[in-house]
Amino acid sequence: MYPQGRHPAPHQPGQPGFKFTVAESCDRIKDEFQFLQAQYHSLKVEYDKLANEKTEMQRHYVMYYEMSYGLNIEMHKQTEIAKRLNTILAQIMPFLSQEHQQQVAQAVERAKQVTMTELNAIIGQQQLQAQHLSHATHGPPVQLPPHPSGLQPPGIPPVTGSSSGLLALGALGSQAHLAVKDEKNHHELDHRERESSTNNSVSPSESLRASEKHRGSADYSMEAKKRKAEEKDSLSRYDSDGDKSDDLVVDVSNEDPATPRVSPAHSPPENGLDKARGLKKDAPTSPASVASSSSTPSSKTKDLGHNDKSSTPGLKSNTPTPRNDAPTPGTSTTPGLRSMPGKPPGMDPIASALRTPISLTSSYAAPFAMMSHHEMNGSLTSPSAYAGLHNIPSQMSAAAAAAAAAYGRSPMVGFDPHPPMRATGLPSSLASIPGGKPAYSFHVSADGQMQPVPFPHDALAGPGIPRHARQINTLSHGEVVCAVTISNPTRHVYTGGKGCVKIWDISQPGSKSPISQLDCLNRDNYIRSCKLLPDGRTLIVGGEASTLTIWDLASPTPRIKAELTSSAPACYALAISPDAKVCFSCCSDGNIAVWDLHNQTLVRQFQGHTDGASCIDISHDGTKLWTGGLDNTVRSWDLREGRQLQQHDFTSQIFSLGYCPTGEWLAVGMESSNVEVLHHTKPDKYQLHLHESCVLSLKFAYCGKWFVSTGKDNLLNAWRTPYGASIFQSKESSSVLSCDISADDKYIVTGSGDKKATVYEVIY
């Protein structure tokens, strides 16, 4: 390591001819120190040079990673577009005359024959257009600093080769580089000036600091994108235990505030690339982990330092909720649109590509030109939204555009309750394109074909359709609110928590304390459902106990009128017949108990669910009952004949359901985060995708024109019946476990995991 000519070591004392002096020894030590210092300095300079090269290599690697990722998405996107266009052509061709059919078929075949020469010419033309566009809008592009190893920077890839792959990469790379923001140009200039000054500097540490400062401003952000993409890929490969609610314990602590929907850079309702972030952090030791009233079962109540206080057995389903990897009865899938339980469909890279519009400039716009913008349900109805990554607005890179575009709100949503949460990163041209947002409502035909729903022009307008809802009161219950119900006429709200139901008078604005408290069940057992009889004088309460409690509210002080005891250790949901003579209770053993309220006796049980029955609703005429269970089934029962009519099988546990008061439609909330709207006789259905986690409760408005659903993702969503246009959306601070709508459709009440109920006024 050291040259042979280094200073010799001093002779040992006693050798002949040596005279020891302190000054000479000091001089030798000084020379040795200077030599070592010079060696150290040269090594330091070499180290700094290598560190700078490493930084540059990492930066280039991230750039190429972005480009390859974007190309992969683009390839899948264009493949899917081609499939869909072929399907459309195949459907339209039979309507043509025989002569025209032959001409069209020949034209289609010719269109499929794309030679390498044509491909190279097209890519070269796109490069020229992008360069002219960049010169016109931003002036001359700022070139990258010279690469230390002599490699060509990605902004100027070679275009002389005949390989179409290299040409495609070059086209994308050059345009991605030319489209960099002015702010980044400033960073590049600043970095180059700093490099030129520091390369001549004596102190290499200054150079290192300068390069690290530049890296912090530009490269770390790209590495963050890369990490996000890798995180997304890993999340799509397996199901997180945090989102698998087989034991049906819902985290009721305040959820991670860093969920994408809270971020001010994103709009609430869309499913996008990084949607799963922040949804995996559940607190299983929350002392109040419980699910929703009348809609969501809970097999356990987890308490710190305690065993399960409820006599409810663990109801973990023997049938694990499978991933929706293949088409199964009840959950239809389309290539590239596979949905994972507990995760949005956008988590699949292919699905995210299909759901992420980039630009409107495309030759595929014609087949859908007849649709007006408010008829579209996001991007999938408009193939014109799928232009190549080379058409990305200049402010955005491929990955950034994909992530940002995935969060824009659909144009048919008439009211945005969170204006600060809109996707501020989107340029106005992209944020306002018609139909350029991800689809969230799909029609699933009898043969499993999934298509985005074209909304009618009156989807969000007309009599009986609300514009939005505003929060007017908060009822601090003090425990997790698993059950809520509203009196008719609208005056009192009943909130069920741990061991008691509290009654609130909402006719008095600003009322902060309950007017009464009904202690029932055991103190440590949660109320799961409470239902008022139509006369408003009787309240029936069920929960994590084998007993249903009937309260007389007409007496001066509410009192227990009777108790109904079943063999099941818990009741998850209740329903009352329209004539108020019969009560139906969903039992944790899967049975549906039928109670005669006048004689206070059990008159029959509907048996069919192989796991706990979680949710229930009754038809408006009182002839049909609908139940959902942890066995992944929804069943309908004929109340006159006392037998099962239908059974719908799904790939996810059923947590909530509601039957439309005007008939025909049944809405079902899933553990997999989907809402499905079924027709009572037809095999086709609608599938809605705005929730990010389990759908815990669901309720139809009494007019039947809309319904609301709430979830573990803290969201309250209002939907149009039956096709699911999003009317409004509200985000709470914790899981929303229960909900109810007043008989006049003017108020909504929700119960949540942060120990309160929220009263909303519906604005028309």
UniProtKB/Swiss-Prot annotation:
Question: What modifications follow translation?
Answer: Ubiquitinated by XIAP/BIRC4. This ubiquitination does not affect its stability, nuclear localization, or capacity to tetramerize but inhibits its interaction with TCF7L2/TCF4. Ubiquitinated at Lys-712 by UBR5 in response to Wnt signaling, leading to substrate recognition by the segregase p97/VCP and degradation by the proteasome.
Gene Ontology terms: biological process: negative regulation of canonical Wnt signaling pathway; negative regulation of cold-induced thermogenesis; regulation of DNA-templated transcription; Wnt signaling pathway
Which molecular function terms from Gene Ontology are attached? transcription corepressor activity
Phosphoserine modified-residue sites: 203, 207, 211, 217, 240, 245, 263, 267, 286, 317, 410
Q: Where is the composition biased (Basic and acidic residues)?
A: 184-196, 209-247, 272-283, 300-309
Does the keyword section mention Phosphoprotein? Answer: yes
WD repeat boundaries on the chain? 476-514, 522-561, 566-605, 608-647, 649-688, 690-729, 731-763
Instruction: Cite the record's Low complexity compositional bias ranges.
Output: 197-207, 284-299
Kindly summarize what the UniProt induction comment says about this protein's expression. Answer: By kainic acid in the dentate gyrus.
- Per the record, the major location class is nucleus
Q: Where is this region: CcN domain?
A: 200-268
Cell compartments where the protein resides: Nucleus
Enumerate the residue ranges of region (SP domain).
Answer: 269-444
Q: Which UniProt keywords apply?
A: Acetylation, Isopeptide bond, Nucleus, Phosphoprotein, Repeat, Repressor, Transcription, Transcription regulation, Ubl conjugation, WD repeat, Wnt signaling pathway
Ranges of biased composition (kind: Polar residues) = 310-322
How is expression of this protein distributed across tissues? Answer: Highly expressed in adrenal gland, small intestine, kidney, lung, ovary and thyroid. Detected at lower levels in pituitary, hippocampus, cortex, cerebellum and testis.
A matching Pfam family: TLE_N
- Provide the residue span(s) of the region labelled GP domain: 132-199
Q: Give residues where Phosphothreonine occurs.
A: 259, 312, 319, 321, 328, 334
- List modified residues, type N6-acetyllysine: 232, 275
What note about domains is in the entry? WD repeat Groucho/TLE family members are characterized by 5 regions, a glutamine-rich Q domain, a glycine/proline-rich GP domain, a central CcN domain, containing a nuclear localization signal, and a serine/proline-rich SP domain. The most highly conserved are the N-terminal Q domain and the C-terminal WD-repeat domain.
Q: Describe the function of this protein.
A: Transcriptional corepressor that binds to a number of transcription factors. Inhibits the transcriptional activation mediated by CTNNB1 and TCF family members in Wnt signaling. The effects of full-length TLE family members may be modulated by association with dominant-negative AES.
**Assembly behavior:** Homotetramer and heterooligomer with other family members. Binds LEF1, TCF7 and TCF7L1. Binds FOXA2. Interacts with TCF7L2/TCF4. Interacts with TBX18 (via engrailed homology 1 repressor motif), leading to decreased of TBX18 transcriptional activity.
Could you identify this protein by its name?
Transducin-like enhancer protein 3
Say which species the protein is native to.
Answer: Rattus norvegicus (Rat)
The opening ranks of the lineage are: Eukaryota, Metazoa, Chordata, Craniata, Vertebrata
